């Protein structure tokens, strides 16, 4: 599986995808950071990640839309399905590679934390809890994005399905408070308060695993009919 992770991770930088994702995220994050810190005099690093979660909603489809759809379009999926590697390892390899890109982006945000330390005394524990929540949110997004990519060979359609799903559950609580617990963004919003909500953490992990398993099932079925 390490070979798949290595191949997929490198592919993000052989193409502009990795650079575009990291670059756009940091540019947009910098804008929100500047507004919060220099306009509103806020030194709460964790609350800036509310904006980071919004940015992630728009950018994750860039990472995931070609994960499997590109393989189908170019015909290389046949090689994956007939290779000695199991479908499970292939899917997990793609998932982990995309997650590493987000993790690298998160590490880059420590620069902003250093700037806040110069202006004030941000809470390191709360910031770390926020980063954990952000990574859990990203993993949930990535797992669904890869699932969407597995059901179509068109990258654009995969991207539209992914972002459409995110926005549907983002705005769902606006119609009724009953749906609040179904919103991934709402679940993330508790982490910047410094609280690790076990129920939300379990939901993130369960959602991620479910999407990965569904992706494996989709690819296994496609393999069985070839």
Model-derived regions: residue spans:
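Aromatic- and glycine-rich beta-strand/loop motifs that create alpha-glucan
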Residues: 1-18, 225
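Hydrophobic alpha-helical transmembrane segments of multi-pass membrane transport/permease proteins
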Residues: 16-36, 51-60, 164-168, 210
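Secretory targeting signals
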Residues: 29-36, 44-51, 55, 97-156
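Terminal transmembrane helical anchor/hairpin motif
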Residues: 37-42, 46, 164-226
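Transmembrane helix boundary and interhelical loop/hinge segments in multi-pass membrane proteins
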Residues: 44-48, 63-81
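Hydrophobic/aromatic residues in alpha-helical transmembrane segments
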Residues: 60-64, 112, 143-144, 214-215
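Residue-level recognition of transmembrane alpha-helices
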Residues: 94-95, 130, 162-163
């Amino acid at each position: 599986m390490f070979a798949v992770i290595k191949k997929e991770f490198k592919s993000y930088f052989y193409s502009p995808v990795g650079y575009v994702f990291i670059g756009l995220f940091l540019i947009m994050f910098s804008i929100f950071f500047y507004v919060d810190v220099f306009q509103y005099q806020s030194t709460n690093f964790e609350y800036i990640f509310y904006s980071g979660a919004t940015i992630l909603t728009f950018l994750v489809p860039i990472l995931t839309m070609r994960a499997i759809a590109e393989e189908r379009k170019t015909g290389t999926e046949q090689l994956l399905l007939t290779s000695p590697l199991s479908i499970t390892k292939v899917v997990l390899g793609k998932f982990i590679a995309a997650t590493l890109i987000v993790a690298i982006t998160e590490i880059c945000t420590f620069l902003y934390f250093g700037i806040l330390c110069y202006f004030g005394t941000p809470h390191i524990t709360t910031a770390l809890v926020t980063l954990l929540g952000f990574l859990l949110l990203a993993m949930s997004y990535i797992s669904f994005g890869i699932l969407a990519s597995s059901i179509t060979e068109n990258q654009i359609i995969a991207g539209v399905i992914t972002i459409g799903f995110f926005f549907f559950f983002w705005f769902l609580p606006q119609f009724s408070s009953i749906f609040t617990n179904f919103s991934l963004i709402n679940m993330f919003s508790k982490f910047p308060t410094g609280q690790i909500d076990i129920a939300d953490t379990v939901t993130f992990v369960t959602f991620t695993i479910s999407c990965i398993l569904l992706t494996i099932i989709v690819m296994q079925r496609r393999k069985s009919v070839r």
